């Protein structure tokens, strides 16, 4: 026989049904069906089954009860739900909403919960001493947290700025920046690298022999002497000997 939850959801039920133990704490069969339909509409049928399957068997009744109270509290107080109503001292309204659902009634949001008797947006009212202390402690924690974050971001920014300043103040950096800032007076479009030209001294200048023409007899080979060497042999020959070299520039 199908349980009341599976019956209203029109799904198959078996002996290992995960929904059956979740609604056994509700007294009547109609109330079980109303609670199942309300929770399934709020969280979705697949979401409800996923929540139930994610917890052990012993915790499933408490889970379904928590989902029912949260769905009713969120319907009545859309901003903070059941937790906000418990915090502001309006838990009796949440319990009344649950009883209304079990009887088959409908719920609607109550705007007065946001501004009347519970502070703005569900926060504790200043008239409650305990609630004021809790709210003050939370605000102090938030301010300290934000101050720490600001100090952290400021220190990161300061360290990065000082590091960039130190980098820009190095001699190599300044030299490179100054060379980049100076405009070039001419365009260097030459493919030959600009190396310093060594000026030949008069003492090292030697007279080159006349290149033979194409019609001359010595166009194939040219004769050079090694008489300019001060001392020592050249290519293993004695000083003053002549060597014939092939003239490739014909």
UniProtKB/Swiss-Prot annotation:
One biological process term in Gene Ontology: simple leaf morphogenesis
Region listing for Disordered, in residue ranges: 145-227
Start-end of Low complexity biased regions: 157-170
One Pfam family of this chain: LOB
Transmembrane segments: none
Residue ranges of every copy of the LOB domain listed in the record: 1-107
InterPro entries named in the record: LOB
Tissue: Expressed in young shoots, roots, stems, leaves and flowers.
UniProt superkingdom: Eukaryota
Molecular function, one GO term: transcription cis-regulatory region binding
Entries under PROSITE patterns matching the protein: LOB
PANTHER family: LOB DOMAIN-CONTAINING PROTEIN 37, LOB DOMAIN-CONTAINING PROTEIN 38
Family membership noted in the UniProt record: Belongs to the LOB domain-containing protein family.
Protein name: LOB domain-containing protein 37
Encoding gene (name): LBD37
């Amino acid at each position: 026989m199908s349980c009341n939850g599976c019956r209203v959801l029109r799904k198959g039920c078996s002996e290992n049904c995960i929904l059956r133990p979740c609604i056994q704490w509700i007294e009547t069969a109609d109330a079980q069906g109303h609670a199942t339909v309300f929770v399934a509409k709020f969280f979705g049928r697949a979401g409800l089954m996923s929540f139930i399957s994610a917890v052990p068997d012993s915790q499933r009744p408490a889970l379904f009860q928590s989902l029912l109270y949260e769905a009713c509290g969120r319907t009545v107080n859309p901003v903070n739900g059941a937790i906000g109503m418990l915090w502001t001292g309006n838990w009796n309204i949440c319990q009344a909403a649950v009883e209304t659902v079990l009887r088959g009634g409908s719920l609607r949001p109550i705007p007065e919960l946001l501004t009347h008797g519970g502070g703005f947006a569900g926060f504790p009212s200043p008239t409650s001493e305990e609630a004021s202390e809790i709210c003050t402690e939370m605000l102090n924690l938030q301010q300290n947290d934000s101050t720490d974050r600001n100090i952290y971001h400021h220190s990161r920014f300061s360290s990065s700025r000082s590091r960039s300043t130190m980098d820009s103040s190095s001699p190599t950096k300044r030299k490179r920046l100054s060379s980049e800032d100076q405009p070039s007076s001419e365009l260097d479009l030459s493919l030959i690298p600009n190396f310093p030209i060594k000026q030949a001294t008069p003492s090292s200048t030697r007279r080159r022999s006349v290149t033979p023409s194409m019609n001359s007899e010595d166009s194939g080979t040219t004769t050079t002497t090694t008489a300019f060497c001060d001392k020592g042999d050249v290519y293993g020959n004695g000083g003053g000997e002549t060597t014939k070299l092939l003239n490739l520039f014909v």
